[in-house]
Amino acid sequence: AALALTLVLPGLAAYEMPIQTVNEGESVYLFNADIDKPILEQNADQQRYIASLTKMMTALLFLESGKDMNAEITIPASLTQEFKDIQNANGSTINLRIGETVRRIDLLYGLLVASANDAASVIASDVSDGDLTAFVARMNQRAKELGCTSTSFTCVHGLYDYGNVSSAHDL
């Protein structure tokens, strides 16, 4: 019984306690699904650079693509310049190489666990038949379908492109 009270009481206390706001310039959107309303909003619709959160949309589209996650693919030569750009930016990678064969599921793990920018590019290329621009367009379309009105993508990984933005409310 003591354990049950320990688990329940903090949750009840959260409903009773006033919620302090965060620093004035920060964004927050805290939604309580139990009561179906936001319990804290501050600059919730302000667009912010989202960096590697971009990879969540890349992962979503990969999973929705219906591709066999256990199948192996070969990393295409068309990604040579993309890989050079990623390497020059000194971001996270799993050191994929052009011509290497890799399972799709391993790309997904690299994307989500290591935040690997090279994995994001290979995934996008795989899903869009080599057209990263088309993949980015699909990312933006999917964001709109999800009701994300403050979200805009301009690259598949969020590494060096300041055009990838979203808001606390959208996220």
State each model region's role.
Residues 13-169:
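Active-site-adjacent loops and short helices of periplasmic peptidoglycan-processing enzymes
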Residues 1-14:
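Sec-dependent N-terminal signal peptides of Gram-positive bacterial secreted proteins and lipoproteins
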